[in-house]
UniProtKB/Swiss-Prot annotation:
This is 3-hydroxyacyl-[acyl-carrier-protein] dehydratase FabZ. The keyword Cytoplasm applies. The gene is fabZ. It catalyses: a (3R)-hydroxyacyl-[ACP] = a (2E)-enoyl-[ACP] + H2O. Disulfide bonds: none annotated. The lineage of its organism: Bacteria, Pseudomonadati, Pseudomonadota, Gammaproteobacteria, Cellvibrionales. It is found in: Cytoplasm. GO terms for cellular component: cytoplasm; membrane. Involved in unsaturated fatty acids biosynthesis. Catalyzes the dehydration of short chain beta-hydroxyacyl-ACPs and long chain saturated and unsaturated beta-hydroxyacyl-ACPs. The keyword Lyase applies. Belongs to the thioester dehydratase family. FabZ subfamily. It comes from the Bacteria. GO terms for biological process: fatty acid biosynthetic process; lipid A biosynthetic process. It comes from Cellvibrio japonicus (strain Ueda107). Keywords: Cytoplasm, Lipid A biosynthesis, Lipid biosynthesis, Lipid metabolism, Lyase. One of its GO terms (molecular function) is (3R)-hydroxyacyl-[acyl-carrier-protein] dehydratase activity.
Length: 145
């Protein structure tokens, strides 16, 4: 279990772009389960869409990538303060299945598929109340800053 203070040790992101509120399960080298609470106060809703707020798919992808980054950093025993950064390197097989709206709790799940020379591949999904909202295969690269 990781609260937002510990999450901030493993992700360089800050408001309004820190998209993981809590980690509820993490098995180093294997998987992570985290969540993001979606509130009407999200900056993105000022433009997407003011009269019918929908959390953008690209933000769901970013949230899955951030959860994957935490898993990668914890697995490697590194933190951004050590001079490492985890970069979003690619995304494949993206599917959006359900809108995510204010009041939803977006559960983020990521599983390590492979790692080779600092390039990590993750199978990710985001759900709301057990219903699939999005899925993707995400590539991240561990690089020195």
């Amino acid at each position: 279990m990781m609260d937002v203070n510990e999450i901030r040790e493993y992700l360089p992101h800050r408001y309004p772009f820190l998209l993981v509120d809590r980690v509820v399960e993490l098995v180093e080298g294997e998987s992570i389960i985290a969540y993001k609470n979606i509130t009407v106060n999200e900056e993105v809703f000022n433009g997407h869409f003011p009269q019918n707020p929908v959390f953008p798919g690209v933000m769901i992808l970013e949230a899955m990538a951030q959860a994957s980054g935490i898993l990668g950093f914890k697995t490697m025993g590194k933190k951004p303060e050590d001079g490492s950064i985890y970069l979003f390197a690619g995304v494949d097989d993206v599917r959006f299945k359900r809108q995510v709206v204010p009041g939803d709790r977006l559960q983020l799940e990521s599983r390590v598929i492979s790692e080779k020379r600092g390039i990590w591949k993750f199978e990710c999904k985001a759900t709301v109340d057990g219903v699939l909202a999005a899925s993707a295969t995400i590539l991240c690269a561990d690089r020195k800053v």
